[in-house]
Amino acid sequence: MRNLKFAVLIPAYNEEKDLPHVLSRLPCEKKNIIVVDDGSNDSTAAVAAKCGVTVLRQGKNLGKGAAQRRGFEYLKDEPYDGVITIDADGQHDPALIPQFLKKARDGNYDIVVGTRVLEPGTAMPLIRLLTNLTTSLVVSLMSGQRIRDSQSGYRYLSARVIRNIPLTTSRYQTESEVLIKAGRQGYRIGEMPISTIYSGQKSNVNKFIDTMRFIGLCIKSLWG
């Protein structure tokens, strides 16, 4: 069985500090790495370009989901079997990418979600933990497939998922939207544990507004 041909997509907003370290550790050629700069106020785009990867720039900050959609649109006609999405802040270990690909290939999964396991001595902020547990339960019920970490940004998506599933959201709810739609359409969703380190950096999530957006997504999905 042949290895999967893949691209790496990194949405980035004000990540000039951590992005170079992430890019240097990716186990693939630079031509297969796409960074979407989501209207950063710092030198994120310049730093990415200096590293020799493809950079797509949003004119203003439109949200993580919008950045992912821009990347998917760019990649959907390219000759890849799938796409790895990974966050730009260094919380995810790029060395796990081969395991994502093996899981997808051996299990015939269209999506593989990285289920976060905390490193010893670190802890997920309580509000983030409770929010993730709740949203994961809701997404599991709505998608018809068990998903323990619906908010994880580290995942594999097959080419047919990014080509065939239309996404309409623009913020953090996009990661839930693709799981709900994929599950309902019969795409196979798998999971694998990933190590995660929280270094105390400030989250870009607005707890109230993004919760309202998630609720709106759920209501729309129920009637969709």
Task: List the model feature ranges, each with a label.
Residues 7-11, 34, 57:
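Short hydrophobic beta-strand elements that form part
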Residues 58-77, 94-172, 198-223:
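Acceptor/aglycone-binding surface of glycosyltransferases and processive sugar-polymer synthases
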Residues 80-89:
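Short beta-strand-to-loop acidic/aromatic patch adjacent to the donor-nucleotide binding site
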